[in-house]
Amino acid sequence: VRSRRQRQMCIRDRPAPEQADLAVLVSRFQSAGVPVKYSWIGRELPDDKGLQLTLFRIAQEAMTNILRYAPTTKRVEVTVSRHAGTAVLTVDNDAAPGSRPMHGSGKGLIGMRERAAVYGGTVDAGPTSTGWRVRAVLRWDEDDEGTSPWQMPL
C-alpha cells in the first residue's frame, strides 16, 4: 500500500497542452493505486489545445483532491460526455464506509471554476450520498472549433 505522498508524486508530472490526455491521467492514478473507471461518451473534443488542457487540468485537480482529502476512497468514476458544443466532465468518488471527509482551502475549486469560465462554463462540487462529485461544463462555438480563448488578443 502506497502512502498518500507517494501516490501524489506518481501523478505530479505536468503535461504540455498537446499531451493533455485524460486516459494517460487516469492510468497514472490507477498506477498509484486509485481504482478509477473512465468513460467518454460522444465525439472527441475539437482541435483546440486550450480547451483540451482546460478539461485535463480540471480532471487533474478533481482527482488530486481525492488523493488529498478522501484518502479512503474505494472507487472513482471519471466521465466525459461531449455533444453539440458542450463537454461535461464528471468526477465522482465513493468513500469507504465510516470515513470522514477532510476539507481544503477551496483554492482548487476556485481555479477549476476560473478555467471553466474561459470556455463559458461552470464547475459545481459537493457531497453525494456516497462521496463527492465535481461536475464541469465547458462550452464552445461548434462553428468555430479552432479558435481558443487562450489564443485571442487581450
Predicted regions mapped to residue ranges:
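Glycine-rich nucleotide-binding loop
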Residues: 85-88, 96-97, 128-135
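Flexible, glycine-/charge-rich segments associated with ATP-binding catalytic modules
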Residues: 117-154
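Short beta-strand/loop element within the Bergerat-fold HATPase_c
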Residues: 75-85, 90-94
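Glycine-rich/acidic phosphate-handling loop/turn and adjacent ATP-lid/helix
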Residues: 88-109
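Conserved short strand/loop->alpha-helix "switch" segment adjacent to the catalytic nucleotide/phosphoryl-transfer site
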Residues: 38-59
